[in-house]
């Protein structure tokens, strides 16, 4: 993939799969996964982008889309994923939408 193609990659919400996806020519090349919790929170627990797509800011684009959508729905963000935590640390505009991680959040995250 060259830098020009990065603009052609789309981001979509796969509600059934409980994830936001980076899509290149119909193929999922990255995702950030979440679990709904308590009716008003989303626990983001894992983000991945294929290695060949790395270094182009795509993970940041993906996470920004997911967090913006979550906030627009009036839900709070629970950051278990290290990438999402790091992103939030650099973007204080999300601060009011972030809920602190509690033990019950960790227990709700899928294993494996």
Predicted region positions:
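Basic, gly/Ser/Thr/Pro-rich low-complexity segments located predominantly at protein N termini
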Residues: 31, 35, 60-62, 86
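A conserved beta-turn-beta hairpin within the catalytic core of GNAT-like acetyltransferases
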Residues: 36-44
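A short, internal acetyl-CoA/4′-phosphopantetheine-binding micro-motif in the GNAT/acyltransferase core
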Residues: 47-54
